[in-house]
């Protein structure tokens, strides 16, 4: 069933942490990122064709269209094509980074399975289930936002009698006839659905990583808070519980290390692009867009915002979760514990003080503050265009 991984908790059939990526893996298979056990050759050929269509033909087609048709572009069409061009250039790099470090994805899933083994109580397993459902809901929300942009742009162009993205097509001249126009428009829309889905896949996985990581950090904190609270346990048993918590924390650190290479590079590319693309979109929306194009542009801006902001916000929450874990360790019931227990606790406390953090391209931290600073570039672009009256000049020309 399509929505089976959004179901409510059932004590006899709960989801596990690796199920957080279930819909994402469906998308991986459709985009050629996940090789099946059978028909590998056909799958490889199809994967190469999809990648070439989306990552090679799309930016080249836009460049050719610029050279051949730029004199016929309206300002609205020009800005739409420019914002698409920048994203089409960044998309292959994001896809490449994920696939270069795809071993980290599979390692992260194995580590999540190991973390699940520590979830022995029904309450913990239900907490994991709810976290998995949140991840799968996030994927479907992203899918809706990105698809809404593609469909709304197609509809706005169709209602205006213009091509949605003006991508060069060597086989169909959209000016010849009405049927040629629709062939070119449908070809562009099909291309964009694949390209947008590739972009979606490379944008959503950092968020999925972060959401399920927060669940296991919370469960670890709750286990730490319950240390030495059972009067029926001996000092040796309490120390074993502490050692298990230390091992859980090591699994979490290993998980963060496994996902870090792909995440940092992907977010770095997104930070480079978001300011420019958001600025072009705002110029288009404020100065040139009609009602239909405006709706499509708003959908595009929504897509730009969810590229980075949710994961940046989750990174801030992860930092807070790490601080809460340190506080839980320090305030746990250790005063009357054995010397050996206290020694292990100090070791745990020292390691836990190193927050789980990610940096974009190993240059600046991934956080809400960094995201806002990058997004400010968009307002700088709009101010620059407004002060130089570039919008008026484009309209007159």
Swiss-Prot record:
InterPro entries: 7tm6_olfct_rcpt. Belongs to the insect chemoreceptor superfamily. Heteromeric odorant receptor channel (TC 1.A.69) family. Or2a subfamily. The chain crosses the membrane at residues 44-64, 78-98, 139-159, 193-213, 267-287, 294-314, 355-375. Residues 65-77, 160-192, 288-293, 376-397 are extracellular. GO terms for molecular function: ionotropic olfactory receptor activity; ligand-gated calcium channel activity; odorant binding; olfactory receptor activity. Its main location: membrane. It is found in: Cell membrane. One of its GO terms (biological process) is detection of chemical stimulus involved in sensory perception of smell. This is Odorant receptor 98a. Odorant receptor which mediates acceptance or avoidance behavior, depending on its substrates. The odorant receptor repertoire encodes a large collection of odor stimuli that vary widely in identity, intensity, and duration. May form a complex with Orco to form odorant-sensing units, providing sensitive and prolonged odorant signaling and calcium permeability. The atypical heteromeric and topological design of the odorant receptors appears to be an insect-specific solution for odor recognition, making the OR/Orco complex an attractive target for the development of highly selective insect repellents to disrupt olfactory-mediated host-seeking behaviors of insect disease vectors. Odor-evoked OR currents are independent of known G-protein-coupled second messenger pathways. One of its GO terms (cellular component) is plasma membrane. Residues 1-43, 99-138, 214-266, 315-354 are cytoplasmic. Interacts with Orco. Complexes exist early in the endomembrane system in olfactory sensory neurons (OSNs), coupling these complexes to the conserved ciliary trafficking pathway. It comes from the Eukaryota. Keywords: Cell membrane, Glycoprotein, Membrane, Olfaction, Receptor, Sensory transduction, Transducer, Transmembrane, Transmembrane helix. It holds the Pfam family 7tm_6. PANTHER family: ODORANT RECEPTOR, ODORANT RECEPTOR 19A-RELATED. It is a multi-pass membrane protein. It comes from Drosophila melanogaster. Glycans are attached at residue 187. Expressed in olfactory sensory neurons in the antenna.
């Amino acid at each position: 069933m399509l929505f089976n991984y959004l179901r409510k908790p059932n004590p006899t059939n709960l989801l596990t942490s690796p199920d957080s990526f279930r819909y994402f893996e469906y998308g991986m298979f459709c985009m050629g990122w996940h090789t099946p056990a059978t028909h590998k050759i056909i799958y490889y050929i199809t994967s190469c064709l999809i990648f070439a269509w989306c990552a090679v033909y799309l930016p080249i087609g836009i460049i050719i269209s610029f050279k051949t048709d730029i004199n016929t572009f309206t300002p609205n069409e020009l800005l739409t094509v420019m914002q698409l061009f920048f994203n089409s250039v960044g998309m292959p790099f994001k896809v490449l980074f994920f696939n270069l470090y795809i071993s980290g994805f599979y390692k992260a899933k194995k580590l999540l399975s190991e973390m699940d083994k520590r979830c022995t109580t029904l309450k913990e397993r239900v907490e994991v289930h709810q976290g998995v459902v949140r991840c799968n809901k996030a994927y479907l929300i992203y899918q809706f936002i990105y698809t809404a942009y593609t469909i709304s742009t197609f509809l706005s162009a169709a209602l205006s009698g213009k091509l949605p993205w003006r991508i060069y097509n060597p086989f169909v001249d959209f000016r010849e006839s009405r049927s040629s126009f629709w062939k070119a428009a449908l070809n562009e829309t099909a291309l964009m659905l694949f390209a947008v889905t590739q972009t979606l896949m490379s944008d959503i996985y950092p968020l999925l990583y972060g959401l399920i990581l927060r669940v296991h950090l919370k469960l670890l904190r709750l286990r730490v808070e319950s240390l030495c609270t059972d009067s029926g346990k001996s000092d040796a048993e309490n120390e074993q519980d502490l050692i298990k918590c230390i091992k859980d924390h090591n699994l979490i650190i290993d998980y963060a290390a496994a996902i870090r290479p792909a995440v940092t590079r992907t977010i770095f590319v997104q930070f480079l692009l978001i300011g420019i693309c958001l600025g072009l979109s705002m110029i288009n929306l404020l100065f040139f867009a009609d009602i239909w194009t405006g709706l499509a542009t708003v959908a595009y801006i929504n897509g730009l915002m969810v590229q980075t902001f949710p994961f940046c916000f989750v990174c801030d929450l992860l930092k807070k979760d790490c601080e809460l874990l340190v506080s839980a360790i320090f305030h746990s019931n250790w005063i009357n514990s054995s010397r050996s227990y206290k020694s292990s606790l100090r070791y745990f406390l020292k390691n836990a003080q190193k927050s789980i953090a990610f940096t974009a391209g190993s240059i600046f931290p991934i956080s809400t503050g960094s995201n806002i600073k990058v997004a400010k570039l968009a307002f700088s672009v709009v101010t620059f265009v407004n002060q130089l009256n570039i919008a008026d000049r484009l309209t007159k020309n």
